[in-house]
């Protein structure tokens, strides 16, 4: 299969639409020998800020000397943009190769009586396969929609991140903040730490789920924070309370919400650093500056 053939196949899957659920992706990754279990992952959901937090974390991990993959959606120009390693999009050749292997698994799944996987499910499986083949140290995985029934939720990550929760996709996720928060909180796994900037009733849903799962919870405004020092259209300077003391952090994105996103990424990196000594305060700050 060449790249053009791969693209024709991927685009042909668009007609199957969006169908939330775990049965298809579970069957697909099983046929691919569970590539998602061969990589360490960070799972990110939330109404806004997923992309920013994913970018910050990816740069931090790369700056820490880790081979770091990132899976995001949607793309701007090419599907290749959805899966990258250390900031480099998957090549056309590798894209075609993982498409061919994943298509073979889809064909087997269908022959065995399975339901046709959606485009997003197939691309998600492709990303897991590519990252496993490349033996990445970490993969930052962004949820497509919601969380609980999203195809990315087959992973058991090192860390779960829920940026925030507001009304979105009410036709699929629910018509209240609480209902949508339940979908977002669906990524929380047993004993896996959670970092969030959610507040109000959404936070309470996340807090209850975290307690039920015995998952340590870190909340913006309670367990960590950020204080703006100076800002312009080009960059912002704020104070962040590391364990060793407050440090000045510069980001190159405007808007108060970006400071919150940056703080979430910083806390996420600190949590990961508890198990990975290569992720130091110096490397974290370097990664933030490179974002």
Regions found by a protein language model. Give the residues of each.
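N-terminal leader/targeting and accessory segments in enzymes
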Residues: 1-48, 52-67, 76-78, 104, ...
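Acidic, Mg2+-coordinating active-site environments of NTP-dependent enzymes
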Residues: 110-111, 115, 135-142, 157-248, ...
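Buried hydrophobic packing segments
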Residues: 57, 61, 127-131, 262-272
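ATP-dependent carboxylate-amine ligase catalytic core
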Residues: 22, 26-30, 34-37, 63-155, ...
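Short glycine/threonine-rich catalytic loop with a Thr-x-Gly-x-Asp
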Residues: 68, 233, 253-266, 291
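Histidine-centered active-site/metal-ligand motif
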Residues: 43, 75, 169-170, 257
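A generic structural signal for residues located within well-ordered alpha-helices
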Residues: 20, 52, 120-123, 183, ...
